[in-house]
Amino acid sequence: MSALQKYPRISDMVMPAARRLPAFVHAYLAAGTGQGQAMARNEAAYADIHLMPRFLRGRVTPDTHCSVFGKTYSAPFGVSPIGLQSLIWPGAEKILCRAAAEAGIPYTLSTVAGEDVETIGPISDGHGWFQLYAPNDHGVMRDLLARAKQAGFTTLVLTADVPGPSRREDMRLAGAPIGSRNPMSITPRVFWQCITHPAWSFAVLANGGKFRFKNLEPYSSESALENITDYIGSQLNGSLTWDYLDEIRK
């Protein structure tokens, strides 16, 4: 049975994913912030989009291609950025990027992804977009953008609406150590979720057993997750202004 036959709708994948992933990981993937009102409004807005059919036009071959920023893609959507996708499944950045390149749609790599631009850029086959959380240090910002461009990313996605750490209440309820210096601290509850989801746990161990923010490691004195987390907290604190945007354009 093909994946399309098994999961004909996106909603059909929700429950299998919930069974396969530890609860704190699934909450990170599937839930929004706070009580989830913004996420619910977004889903309602997408559900309110209607396709208007046109009849009596003879034989027509549907064409979903579209042009964005001077480049043509096979469909009017792409893969949005998710930080630390490798937490959800080891190697997820590579898996999704290859799938997007094969489908001819954009793949957007997050600043705080588990893989770096140098790894993902060549896989994207010219379809790579890079999402930037603007660092306070302009030198780091310029170097990140230079690395992304050198790696083959063609489009910049600048995130402006995250002024600070979000309230991930579903993750807190699922047992994730929210507020800890090391967000991957192994609490008894997290440990139990890991051993009761062996497929995910073995995949993580086979991938080295570590979660990393590889794009940002060159700018921190140590690569340990807790130090990178401290660095992210000090550098990515929502201080974006129009002057900063002008600096990016230069």
Residue ranges and their predicted role:
Residues 65-66, 76, 80-81, 113:
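Active-site microenvironments in enzyme catalytic cores
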Residues 1-70, 179-182, 186-240:
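An N-cap/entry alpha-helix motif that binds or orients negatively charged groups
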Residues 83-85, 110-116:
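Short glycine-enriched loops at secondary-structure junctions
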Residues 34-37, 87-93:
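A structural motif shared across PLP-dependent enzymes of the aminotransferase-like
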Residues 75-77, 96-105:
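A short, Lys/Arg-enriched amphipathic alpha-helix followed by its capping loop at the start of a domain
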Residues 117, 124-133:
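A structural-propensity feature for long, helix-poor, extended segments
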Residues 77-80, 107-109, 128-132, 156:
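Hydrophobic faces of well-ordered beta-strands that scaffold small-molecule active sites
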Residues 84, 97-98, 102, 119-123, ...:
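Alpha/beta enzyme core
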